[in-house]
């Protein structure tokens, strides 16, 4: 199906809320076709900036269940007023989380997943200017009608969090020995063993480091996913070679007051994963859900830095 390069969209059609729309093709088809099922696309990656971006999406069917197979396509639009101009188009691939592939994995009862996700749709996109943008995602599944959904998002001029290639903040984060009860710095039940290392101390000791910013019990995103569980499951595979630190998002969850380290790292969403090399430089960062394969590949690359 051929789409015109410029698509007129009303302000309602690309509102700040997620769209539930039919196909955005202009023109009248030669023969009547059934209206595609009403679906929803949710951005898993919460931060997008001018330049190259990793974009992750969750596509929900008419019953609110994640769509996890098929051939995907994404079109990115720059929005100006009530019009949207096509800027790029790319394939979107479904990537399973694949926790079961890790030896010794067992599902943790404390994990709070807002959606029963087994993975996410992944692509890359380059944005040339800040401001409002939109994405239209289509998924073609064998034996099913084409599904199409749109949403809008903002592109920032620059990230508020540490950039890849920049020094990581030398944070003096709270650790287990600083508090009377581990629940002061972890909402995980039971808590793991990512609370014994200060970020500043790991960097000073030239230890590679994974820093996870997430809140297992108070996930505020619909697609925050099992990030804590993913990192905790991977940790034993690399614990000899690097340190793992979990930072809760909220100091005061009821009033949404963030932890000091969250503020120091400039984070405005969750979850986030940062990989810091032995020189204290940020090598990878992930906004939103990250798959096991992506995370392990990034860890291996970080450990290889001398």
Task: Please give the residue ranges for each predicted region.
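Bacterial N-terminal signal peptides that target proteins for export
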Residues: 2-12
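Thiol-/selenol-based redox modules, centered on thioredoxin-like
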Residues: 159-162, 169, 175-180, 193, ...
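Thioredoxin-like thiol-disulfide oxidoreductase module
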Residues: 239, 245-270, 275-282, 292, ...
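Active-site-proximal beta-strand/loop segments in catalytic clefts of secreted hydrolases
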Residues: 213-216, 247-250, 287-289
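Contiguous segments within soluble domain cores/interaction surfaces
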Residues: 28-128, 132-185
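Short active-site neighborhood of thiol/selenol oxidoreductases, capturing the structured segment around
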Residues: 181-183, 191, 199-220
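C-terminal motif of bacterial Sec signal peptides marking the signal peptidase cleavage site
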Residues: 19-22
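Typically the conserved alpha-helix immediately C-terminal to a functionally engaged Cys/Sec
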Residues: 221-238
């Amino acid at each position: 199906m051929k789409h015109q390069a410029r698509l007129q969209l009303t302000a309602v059609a690309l509102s700040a809320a997620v769209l539930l729309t039919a196909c955005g093709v202009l023109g009248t088809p030669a023969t009547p076709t059934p209206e595609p099922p009403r679906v929803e696309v949710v951005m898993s990656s919460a931060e997008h900036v001018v330049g190259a971006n990793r974009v992750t999406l969750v596509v929900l069917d008419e019953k609110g269940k994640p769509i996890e197979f098929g051939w995907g396509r994404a079109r990115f639009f720059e929005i100006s007023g009530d019009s949207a101009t096509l800027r790029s188009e790319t394939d979107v691939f479904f990537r399973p989380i694949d926790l079961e592939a890790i030896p010794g994995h067992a599902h943790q009862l404390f994990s709070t997943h807002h959606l029963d996700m087994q993975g996410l749709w992944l692509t890359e996109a380059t944005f040339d200017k800040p401001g409002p943008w939109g994405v239209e995602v289509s998924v073609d599944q064998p034996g099913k009608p084409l599904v199409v959904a749109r949403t809008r998002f903002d592109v920032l001029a620059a990230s508020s969090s540490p950039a890849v290639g920049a020094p990581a903040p030398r944070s003096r984060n709270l650790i287990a020995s600083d508090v009377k009860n581990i629940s002061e710095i972890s909402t995980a039940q039971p808590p793991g063993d990512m609370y014994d290392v200060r970020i500043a101390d790991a960097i000073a000791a030239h230890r590679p480091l994974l820093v996870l910013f997430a809140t297992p019990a108070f996930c505020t995103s619909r697609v925050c996913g099992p990030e804590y569980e993913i990192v905790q499951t991977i940790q034993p595979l690399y614990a000899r070679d690097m340190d793992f630190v979990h930072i809760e998002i909220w100091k005061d969850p009821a009033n949404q007051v963030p932890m000091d380290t969250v503020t120091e790292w400039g984070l405005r969403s969750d979850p986030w994963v940062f990989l810091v090399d032995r020189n204290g430089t940020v090598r990878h960062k992930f906004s939103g859900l990250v798959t096991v394969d992506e995370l392990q590949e990034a860890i291996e690359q970080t450990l290889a830095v001398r």
